[in-house]
Swiss-Prot record:
HAMAP family: Exonuc_7_S. It is an enzyme of class 3 (hydrolase). Transmembrane segments: none annotated. This is Exodeoxyribonuclease 7 small subunit. GO terms for cellular component: cytosol; exodeoxyribonuclease VII complex. It holds the Pfam family Exonuc_VII_S. It comes from Leifsonia xyli subsp. xyli (strain CTCB07).
Length: 92
């Protein structure tokens, strides 16, 4: 397996890291690697799994922020409509 250095894993996107992790797991499951190769694959797999987790945590944070922003916008819009309704009732 031609793998990039562990330090380069941080440059991988989620799908790239996930796909490589699948390849690493498959290679480990085949059991044809030497002990040294297996340890290197294991370490790479751990680093790839961490990278995937970082992406998922980041994606969740972005979704949470978007939901909070949407809820805030909806709350602001409701407040504005309520204020307009009160203003119209006061002037009648």
């Amino acid at each position: 397996m031609d793998a990039m250095p562990l330090s380069d894993i941080s440059a991988l996107g989620y799908e790239e890291a996930r796909d490589e992790l699948v390849r690493v797991v498959t290679e480990l499951e085949q059991g044809s690697a030497t002990l040294e190769e297996s340890l290197a694959l294991w370490e790479r797999g751990e680093a790839l799994a961490r990278r995937c987790e970082e992406w998922l945590i980041g994606a969740k944070a972005r979704l949470d922020a978007a939901r909070a922003g949407a809820a805030e916008s909806a709350g602001t819009a409701k407040s504005a409509v309520a204020a307009d309704s009160r203003g119209a009732a006061d002037s009648a």
